[in-house]
Amino acid sequence: MKSEGYTFNQETTLCGHSILRTIYRAKQLGYIIELHYVCVDSPAIAKKRIAERVKMGGHGIPDKDIEKKFGESLRNLHKTIDLCDLAALYDNTDEFRRFAIYKNVQLIRVSKIIPKWYKKWQEEGHYLDTSLDEMIQ
């Protein structure tokens, strides 16, 4: 695809291994990988937002799936950043804002005010549970 000049965009929750394999393969093919990751402080906030969306006619997601995907997405974030040429992280807990930028795995910019979920994510080291090599096989 790259040799033919194609670019593409993939919207994802970063859950499961298939998205990591897709990103890895794209990287191997020479694509520039750019991630824009949006998160909120808790699954409870996500549930509330989804309930509001349902009231307005949007689709729902079962609570158990929200909880599962919330944690899984954060666990995959470290591995995904490792594959990215550029990763911008956004917090949407209260007001949507970008607060961190990674370039080639290095944190190059971070706001003075960082969200709770990001602090917790760094402290818990979610990246330690499964190696990237195990996930892309």
Region annotations inferred by a language model:
Residues 1-40, 73, 88:
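Glycine-rich phosphate-binding loop used to anchor ATP phosphates in small-molecule kinases
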Residues 15, 39-45, 94-96:
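Conserved nucleotide-binding/hydrolysis micro-motifs of P-loop NTPases
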Residues 9, 57, 61, 88-91:
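Secondary-structure transition/capping residues
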Residues 28-29, 54-56, 106-110:
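Short, low-complexity, polar/charged sequence segments that are solvent-exposed and flexible
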Residues 80-137:
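NTP-dependent small-molecule kinase module
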Residues 31-79:
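A glycine- and Lys/Arg-enriched "phosphate-lid" helix/loop adjacent to the NTP-binding pocket
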Residues 23-26, 49-52, 102-104:
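Short, glycine/charged-enriched secondary-structure capping and boundary segments
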